[in-house]
Amino acid sequence: GNLSQAAAAQHAYRQAQDARQRMGMLVQSLSDSQVTDIVSVGIGGSDLGPRLVVDALDAIDSRFRVHFISNVDGAAAQRVLSALDPQRTAAIVISKTFTTQETLANAEAAKAWLQAALPGDGMTNHFIGVTAAPEKAEAFGCGRTFAFRDWVGGRYSLWSAVSLSCAVALGPDVFEAMLAGAREMDAHFVSTPLERNAPVLMALAQVFNVDGLHRPARTVAPYAHTLR
């Protein structure tokens, strides 16, 4: 019923707030450490959203460099890892189910690379999981895990713990400002009359182009190279 849905929503909200707080603590911990490089391992929505944000805001001064690994052929992981120092690197493995084969293959490579230089508990702050199945991430060897709900779709996952690499790269102030912008857009969609509602108008324009004008193709032309 509605009560159970409301309770579930409250639980999800508290979980998200807890994740944000823990993300902030990790960012501070990494900032106080010798880590300078972040390796983000994921595919699809677990890779594209964070990659977009880091690329788009690359002008922001940050002590951290973020490297993305999504290709499963092995060469990409080898190329990234061979140029880094494991003592100064933290790997973030992002997978909703923690069963995605492409992601786990690259995660295994990153884990073996880190373990060779950081035996025992040395990997706690260097091998981090972001997932809707935290028990699987822990079993895989992640020293820290950040959870999100399994109903969070890939195209929306940027607004969850999936954006951990963004929080590290951008710093807490810029990251919180980005989330505030998302909240403003949510509020606009919920409260603005339809005739002035930007997402609704964009959707209606697309429907008209396809069904009315029979033009199914759509061009997205970024005004800045970093938004490509």
Tell where the protein language model's regions lie, with residue ranges.
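Gly/Ser/Thr-rich loops at beta-strand to alpha-helix junctions
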Residues: 39-50, 96-104, 134-136, 153-154, ...
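Short acidic, glycine/serine/threonine-rich loops at helix termini
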Residues: 49-54, 78-81, 102-106, 137-142, ...
